[in-house]
Amino acid sequence: MENSTGLKSSLKTRHIVMLSLGGAIGSGLFLGSGKVIAQAGPSVLLSYVLAGLTLYVVMYGVGKMVIHQDDHKAGMAGVVAPFIGDHWAHFADWVYWATWMAVLIAEEAGVSTFLAILIPGVPLWVFALVVAVLGTAINLWSVKAFAETEYWLAFIKVAVILLLIALGIYLLVINDAHLGFVADSAQKVTTKSTAPSFAPNGFSGFLTSLLVVIFSFGGSELAAITVAETENPKVAIPRAIRGVLIRIISFYVIPIFLFLHLLPWSEVSNPDAASPFATIFARVGIPHADKIVLVIIVIAIFSAVNSAIYATSRSLYSRIQGSSTYVGKKLGKLSKNQVPTNAILVSSFVLFIGVLLSAVLGDGFWQFVAGSISFTISIVWILLLVAALVLYFKHKEVTNWFVKLATLVVLIALSLVFIMQIITNPWTLSVFALVICLLSYFSYRKKKSIIEKTFIL
């Protein structure tokens, strides 16, 4: 089935659920959870709960906006434009596009690095080329191919987390010291004798962990740009969103809780220690636990690359849709499977540039670019909250006063977090990100896309 955008509406509710879930469960949980625990101590549990609530408020607003639209257009702009206007919608689309472009180049470097660890002796650029070709091919095939791939990649990640939860609960119940876990409760992180306090590094440590956790959830909003390719989006999107909060908190909070109770503080407080996932799997007796976790990390990062190609191509397509220029028509061209072929190729081109730079420069430059605009995802969340508030107050029957108040509180809190990020980031990174935002804002021209203006068409 097609819609007014020309794209094929073939995404189902199960795809949207896994896209949101997969976007929030990245390599950070498998690789970086130990570092977050070391920074915040037991207070990291509160960080995950608060971040999960923030995400739910944002996604709840997305669901309401989708329900109250009859014509579902592609891209982030298609969701927010009816509420905050075309100019700010244009800004949101390009900031979102720039953010995902950074994700593309950073995650390509990341997945190539981990593949090199698994398969030593192969040049890094070879892995980068494989990732670039595979990710581009999946997205060019069809939106259903992309959705099915993401569904099963997310399924694997969820299955590993469920396995960890089952093993962790089993170990807590039997409290089996001979497996290498600490049986004496005096050695566990939750006691005052080992962890100095609920937040060992004070408020700054808690705040740092909160920032990391909030933006590790970036990608869940991907559901917002799938509306043009979703079967019955008014039903599918809200249904998928309703389950986000419980799933996110369960798949993050429960594993972290188990890490805190099963591993001694001296181990979980060491930021250079092995992944807690690998540690628990190894001590249970699962062979090659470190290799298994590396494979899961590769899957998680490739999933991010795959999603980034989808997000950037749809944002680009939404910006040039309806253009009468030569470049606009070319970029708006759809394949026989109703996917924006040229928009995908342009968006994924950066991956092939990454292949060359992996062979010459390594990934240092790309890590700088990724770090410099990684917090721009908060701008998109803020705009989604503003758009939701406009809907709530314009159509008072949409929701009750509690939801309006909660959305306003989250908006203020997220804005403060964003300001603190700018202050605490190195000034070079903040300036670079500011330039991206200014270009996105001032590039707007009514009924013209940035592509048209760039080529003076």
UniProtKB/Swiss-Prot annotation:
The chain crosses the membrane at residues 16-36, 43-63, 91-111, 114-134, 154-174, 205-225, 243-263, 292-312, 342-362, 373-393, 403-423, 424-444. Disruption phenotype: Deletion of the gene reduces the efficiency of growth at low concentrations of the aromatic amino acids. It is found in: Cell membrane. Disulfide bonds: none annotated. GO terms for biological process: amino acid transport; transmembrane transport. Its main location: membrane. It is a multi-pass membrane protein. InterPro entries: AA-permease/SLC12A_dom. It holds the Pfam family AA_permease. The keyword Iron-sulfur does not apply. GO terms for cellular component: plasma membrane. Keywords: Amino-acid transport, Cell membrane, Membrane, Transmembrane, Transmembrane helix, Transport. Belongs to the amino acid-polyamine-organocation (APC) superfamily. Amino acid transporter (AAT) (TC 2.A.3.1) family. PANTHER family: GABA PERMEASE, GAMMA-AMINOBUTYRIC ACID PERMEASE. Involved in phenylalanine and tyrosine uptake. Also has affinity for tryptophan. Plays no significant role in the excretion of accumulated phenylalanine. This is Aromatic amino acid permease FywP. It comes from Lactococcus lactis subsp. cremoris (strain MG1363).
